[in-house]
Amino acid sequence: PAEVLGAPRRGLSMVFSGDTAPCAALEQAAQGADLLICDATYALPEQEAQAAQWGHSTFGQSAALAARAGAHRLWLTHYSPMITDPEADLPQAQSIFPAAVCGADGMQITLQYEEA
């Protein structure tokens, strides 16, 4: 089989979270994910209680979850209409997880295998 299959390599994973507050199940699913697409309905840390009440996350909570899970990239998404410019709040997430970006309609990525 080695002549046909080549050397083993790590697979790829993408984890998508819809409306959700940070939880152990999401963190477990996101372990080592190449891309985590995660709810960021609220921008500010002081909105964490409100986010929890409605089953959502803040920019910082999603970034912290990505960091704990060892994800490689984080796309924040599902912004509240109160957030008119998600990029303005992005530095807060990037201070926790530097590979965080603001997701947008039509955004695309090609995930590449890491060669052995």
Predicted segments, located by residue:
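Metal-dependent phosphodiesterase/nuclease catalytic metal-binding core
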Residues: 1-76, 87-92, 113-116
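Short strand-turn motif at the edge of the Rossmann-like AdoMet-binding core
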Residues: 79-80
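Substrate-binding N-lobe of the ribokinase-like
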Residues: 83
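Short, electropositive alpha-helical surface patch
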Residues: 86-107
